[in-house]
């Protein structure tokens, strides 16, 4: 994939001056960390990260040794198992004979756009409703590119069924759902790249809800305490933490094993392993300007820390909608808020870091509204494949063999 450097340069130019400054500082910190052998962790949310191609770009950065750990949501796990993005046909459910009472809002039923050959291959794995599938050609509707699997038949159902099978494998081996699923995922997904390169990819506890049965299977695959410890270990080992359009970051800013902004003092008290965000660099790529406002309030008047010290409500004092995690981010000396569209910020950041490290990237994301962004999304639809169940089972068998012979 050729990289459109001119477009990425325009993305940078369109950022406001303060975001340019913090983005440049973020690049510098990331490059410095990697050059001294440090690690970078990425904390992603759902929707925008998928649609802007960010999760696929992060997978590329994992493969090239730039990103060393990822936390994400169950919804992203679901979509990566389905191939990240899908083309689906959205049809009125009534014409297919479905009861509107059980249909999603809008009374719409979705079909995954698949060839007959692809369906025949899938039919070896699961029972398909051939009568329903035959109706997809003549049913009135329109095609749209959406997050893969999810609500479209048959791939949405297939992913939910796979989740139950993967959960069973996890019960046998004691590994997280994400690792086992990653064995069968495309290497151009975060799950697949993580499994291939021994890089942890884990769902945070606040983001376990999502992706239907996938979320439940992820949550049940290992105990909550173990999940929290694994994530704490990832963050402990990271010099740079990048938050990308993520709503819930309590795991980072209010975690049970983090001592600087979280509840880690009590874990330390009880002789459990802990870590500190004190010397780390925190970046956040986000559209929410309140994040920067909260940081300004803290820097200019120490208002946020003062409110905490006096036990006063931060929202009333700051006069802005105050999410819990804003508090720690705003007060952290090494925090860098980059305010803007992640579809613009990530390409600039990734390319600048890769150039500084002398690394050539084979994939690049772009803001989805641009022509390059549209082409990127089409490329993902055509090239990033759904989870390969046979490959996953084969790697599971090899893992069991290694454990048995150890």
What name fits each language-model region?
Residues 1-24:
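N-terminal glycine-rich anion-binding loop in soluble enzyme alpha/beta folds
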Residues 5-8, 24-142, 340, 383, ...:
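Metabolite-binding pocket within alpha/beta catalytic cores that recognizes anionic/polar moieties
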Residues 18-21, 228-240, 246-250, 254-406:
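C-terminal functional extensions of proteins
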Residues 25-41, 163-168, 194-196, 233-238:
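Glycine-rich phosphate/diphosphate-binding loops that line cofactor/substrate pockets in enzymes
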Residues 45-55, 75-79, 180-184, 207-211, ...:
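Gly/Ser/Thr-rich loops at beta-strand to alpha-helix junctions
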Residues 57-63, 218-221, 256-265:
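Short, solvent-exposed amphipathic alpha-helical segments in soluble enzyme
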Residues 94-207:
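Ligand-binding beta-strand-loop-alpha-helix segment within the catalytic cores
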Residues 200-239, 243:
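Active-site rim loops that border cofactor/substrate pockets in soluble metabolic enzymes
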């Amino acid at each position: 994939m050729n990289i459109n450097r001119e477009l990425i340069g325009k993305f940078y130019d369109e950022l406001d001056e303060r975001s340019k400054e913090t983005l440049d500082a973020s690049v510098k910190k990331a490059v410095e960390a990697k050059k001294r052998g440090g690690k970078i962790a990425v904390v992603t949310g759902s929707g925008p990260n998928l649609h802007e191609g960010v999760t696929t770009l992060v997978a590329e950065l994992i493969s090239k040794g730039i990103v060393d750990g990822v936390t994400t949501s169950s919804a992203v796990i679901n979509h990566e198992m389905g191939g990240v993005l899908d083309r689906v046909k959205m049809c009125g459910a009534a014409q297919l004979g479905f009861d509107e009472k059980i249909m999603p809002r809008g009374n719409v039923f979705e079909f995954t756009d698949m060839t007959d050959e692809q369906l025949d291959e899938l039919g070896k794995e699961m029972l398909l409703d051939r009568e329903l599938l035959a109706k997809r050609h003549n049913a009135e509707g329109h095609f749209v590119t959406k997050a893969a699997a999810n609500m479209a038949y048959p791939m949405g159902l297939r992913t939910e069924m796979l989740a139950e099978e993967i959960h069973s494998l996890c019960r046998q081996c004691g590994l997280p759902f994400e690792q086992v699923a990653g064995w069968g995922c495309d290497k151009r997904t975060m799950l697949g790249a993580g499994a291939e390169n021994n890089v942890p990819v884990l769902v945070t506890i606040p983001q376990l809800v999502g992706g239907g049965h996938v979320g439940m299977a992820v949550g049940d695959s290992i105990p909550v305490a173990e999940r929290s410890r694994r994530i704490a270990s990832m963050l402990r080992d990271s010099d740079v933490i990048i938050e990308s359009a993520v709503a819930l970051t309590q795991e980072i800013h209010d975690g049970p094993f983090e001592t600087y902004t979280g509840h880690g003092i009590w874990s330390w008290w009880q002789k459990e392993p802990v870590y500190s965000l004190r010397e780390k660099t925190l970046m956040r790529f986000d559209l929410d300007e309140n994040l920067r406002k909260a940081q300004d309030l803290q820097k200019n008047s120490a208002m946020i820390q003062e409110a905490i010290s006096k036990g006063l409500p931060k929202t009333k004092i700051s006069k802005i909608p105050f999410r819990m995690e804003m508090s720690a981010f705003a007060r952290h000396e090494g925090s860098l808020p980059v305010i803007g569209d992640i579809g613009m910020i990530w390409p600039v950041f990734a390319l600048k870091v890769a150039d500084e490290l002398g690394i050539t990237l084979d994939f690049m994301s772009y803001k989805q509204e641009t022509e390059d962004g549209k082409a990127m999304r089409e490329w993902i639809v055509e090239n990033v494949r759904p989870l390969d169940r046979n490959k996953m089972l084969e790697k599971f068998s090899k893992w069991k063999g290694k454990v048995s012979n150890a």
